[in-house]
From Swiss-Prot:
Keywords: Amino-acid biosynthesis, Cytoplasm, NADP, Oxidoreductase, Proline biosynthesis. This is Pyrroline-5-carboxylate reductase. One of its GO terms (biological process) is L-proline biosynthetic process. GO terms for cellular component: cytoplasm. Pfam families: F420_oxidored (PF03807), P5CR_dimer (PF14748). PROSITE patterns: P5CR. It is found in: Cytoplasm. It comes from Glycine max (Soybean). The keyword Cytoplasm applies. GO terms for molecular function: pyrroline-5-carboxylate reductase activity. It is an enzyme of class 1 (oxidoreductase). Signal peptide: none annotated. Expressed in all plant tissues, but mostly in nodules.
């Protein structure tokens, strides 16, 4: 079957599923100017709060998922993994190769999505929760009939909520363990830093503010300077000083190995669940 190009300058975007991730993507697209809200639609069946969230920035809320697919050139599946097969199977007659299909459902492989949809013009994307503040780390993998132009459209769309990379799907379990679950590891680290500040005598609100800004600043140093984190660490570590003393304690506690083990364990669990 002939693959029809998606009109990059005028395509319509539909979300199957109206949860927080779909909202984050839609808001990012509107905020960045990638798409006007008039070209975005979703369906909300019962939850009035979700309907209100989308309508608050101009997205069209339609009566059914069927309507969303009919009116959309690009269809994003943003439903819980256990519901994907049922949802896709019901929409199969409408999922022609005129449509570019995108899945953000965790753990659902392209081969299954393509089989259920009867369409291999699919792109799988793994975003993470900082999409809500425009700082997602997303990775995409293209299915059998997805074109380079399709990939460019999705890269621009997900670029509106952070940064996006392309990778083979075989890496997605490891990506889940790192960037998918990673925000929770960092939240734990921020909480621990703040608790350490309190233990050292700081007021709780000041300690938490300093901890979160310190992590944000350190991450920005890595991404913006291009320096290896080990070099940046060495740059602020003086002989016999406070920082090397703190690092010594972290090394004694197995800090590096514990973080590495967390990523590996989460990746293993992702493989078990997919």
């Amino acid at each position: 079957m002939e693959i029809f190009p998606i009109p990059a300058e005028s395509y319509t975007l539909g979300f199957i599923g109206a949860g927080k991730m779909a909202e984050s993507i839609a808001r990012g697209a509107v905020r960045s100017g990638v798409l006007p809200p008039s070209r975005i639609r979703t369906a909300v069946h019962f939850n009035l709060a979700r309907r209100g969230a989308f309508e608050s920035f101009g997205v069209t809320v339609l009566p059914s998922n069927d309507d969303v697919v009919r009116e959309s050139d690009v269809v994003v599946l943003s439903v819980k993994p256990q519901l994907v097969k049922d949802v896709v199977s019901k929409l199969t007659p409408l999922l022609t190769k005129h449509k570019l299909l995108v899945s953000v459902a965790a753990g659902t492989k392209l081969k299954d999505l393509q089989e259920w949809a009867g369409n291999d013009r699919f792109i799988r994307v793994m975003p993470n929760t900082p999409a809500a503040v425009g700082q997602a780390a997303s990775v995409m993998s293209l299915g059998g009939s997805a074109t380079e132009e399709d990939g460019n459209i999705i890269a621009q769309l997900f670029g509106s909520i952070g940064k996006i990379w392309k990778a083979e799907e075989k890496y997605f379990d490891a990506i889940t363990g790192l960037s998918g679950s990673g925000p929770a590891y960092v939240y734990l680290a921020i909480e621990a830093l703040a608790d350490g500040g309190v233990a050292a005598g700081l007021p709780r609100d000041l300690s938490l503010s300093l901890a979160s800004q310190t992590v944000l600043g350190a991450a920005s140093m890595v991404s913006q300077t291009g320096k290896h984190p080990g070099q940046l660490k060495d740059d602020v570590t003086s002989p016999g000083g406070t920082t090397i003393t703190g690092i010594h304690e972290l090394e004694n506690g197995g800090f590096r190995g514990t973080l590495m083990n967390a990523v590996v364990a989460a990746a293993k669990r992702s493989r078990e669940l997919s």
